[in-house]
Amino acid sequence: MLILLLHAVVFSLPYTRATEACLRACPAACTCSHVERGCSVRCDRAGLQRVPQEFPCEAASIDLDRNGLRILGERAFGTLPSLRRLSLRHNNLSFITPGAFKGLPRLAELRLAHNGELRYLHVRTFAALGRLRRLDLAACRLFSVPERLLAELPALRELTAFDNLFRRVPGALRGLANLTHAHFERSRIEAVASGSLLGMRRLRSLSLQANRVRAVHAGAFGDCGALEDLLLNDNLLATLPAAAFRGLRRLRTLNLGGNALGSVARAWFSDLAELELLYLDRNSITFVEEGAFQNLSGLLALHLNGNRLTVLSWAAFQPGFFLGRLFLFRNPWRCDCQLEWLRDWMEGSGRVADVACASPGSVAGQDLSQVVFERSSDGLCVDPDELNFTTSSPGPSPEPVATTVSRFSSLLSKLLAPRAPVEEVANTTWELVNVSLNDSFRSHAVMVFCYKATFLFTSCVLLSLAQYVVVGLQRE
């Protein structure tokens, strides 16, 4: 028992000494704690305007996020042989002196994201960081970076640089033979040139989504044979060269959604035998070339939703057909005999749904799965609109049913048509009576009789007008 106790005391001494050393050199505005591989120093949200002058020698991780740091001088962190992670995100850095990170020989992760005033980096900014594996430069509003900025980072595996102002893929990427992941989202990149990714033979994931890419040059990804995920969605691509993706035989995900593509060419995907996810959604596609998907037998999902497709030919998938999911919703489908194969495949596989018909009129609004394709006497498929025409009995076209508004308008126009006013009719009648009776009846009694006759005649006219209105309503 005594031996075990002595053993525990002996082995706990290094841990106790390391903890004491960590706490002894901890900056006043920071908190320090001992971790497995050294000391963790947290100085985030401490209101710091400059980097503390001293850190624990055993520091393995330093967090200086969300302070007010503006400038990093040379050897800004002294000599910290055990430091592996340094985070300076969300500060106000505007300048980093060349050699600022000297004295950090084991640094593997450097985070400089969200320093919007940085804008520029000297070619020697990251000198002496030979073991750096992860570099985060996101949201620094960088316009450009020197061609050899990353040349002294042979171990770099992951580069995050989204939300910048590059306009083109930085030439600093060339020759980064060990880089595996690169993120350039929302960086206003306008084109992917043929030489911008030279030497990147281990690159597995490249994200260029939400940029302004209008052109991808032929062979642009020629040196990226290990690429598995390529994201080009939400750009301005209207077309692609035939050899745009040539050589990407390991590609598993290709996202071209949210562009301006009007058609899908057969040559685009000829080398992508390992492709599993293909996104062509939210384009303006109206035509898919025959055999466009013929080599994609390993697809798990094909997204064609949100386009302008009216028909999709079986020949687009020949000679084989994939067994994955097919997304076709939000297209103006014409559900005639050209889509009978798709209806049959929907019933048999259950891997596609929500194919709403926009035409012909007899099936508009229905789902393709509900459309019944009849057969002619020769056994040929009959389009729904043709079926509707040939089976209808000939006869005169029925008159359109009048609506309440049309009936009222018609009646009103008839009532308002020019007619002799009742007063004019009465006056005319009175004049006629006067002419005919003027010579023989001139007594007061005769005049009274004429007044009564006029009243009677006027009443008859009004009664006739009322009958005309009633008959008009009945006919309408």
From Swiss-Prot:
Short name of any one Pfam family annotated for the protein: LRRNT
Annotated keywords: Extracellular matrix, Glycoprotein, Leucine-rich repeat, Proteoglycan, Repeat, Secreted, Sensory transduction, Signal, Vision
InterPro entries: Cys-rich_flank_reg_C, Leu-rich_rpt, Leu-rich_rpt_typical-subtyp, LRR_dom_sf, LRR_TM_domain-containing, LRRNT
Tissue-level expression: Expressed abundantly in retina with lower levels in brain, lung, spleen and testis. Not detected in kidney, heart or liver. In the retina, highest expression found in the inner nuclear layer and ganglion cell layer.
Domain of life: Eukaryota
Gene3D superfamilies according to UniProt: Ribonuclease Inhibitor
Family, per entry: Belongs to the small leucine-rich proteoglycan (SLRP) family. SLRP class IV subfamily.
Associated pathology: Defects in Nyx are the cause of the nob (no b-wave) phenotype which is characterized by a decreased sensitivity to light and an absence of the rod b-wave in electroretinograms. An 85-bp deletion in exon 3 results in the loss of 288 residues from the C-terminus of the protein.
Full protein name: Nyctalopin
Organism the protein comes from: Mus musculus
Top-level taxonomy: Eukaryota, Metazoa, Chordata, Craniata, Vertebrata
Gene it is expressed from: Nyx
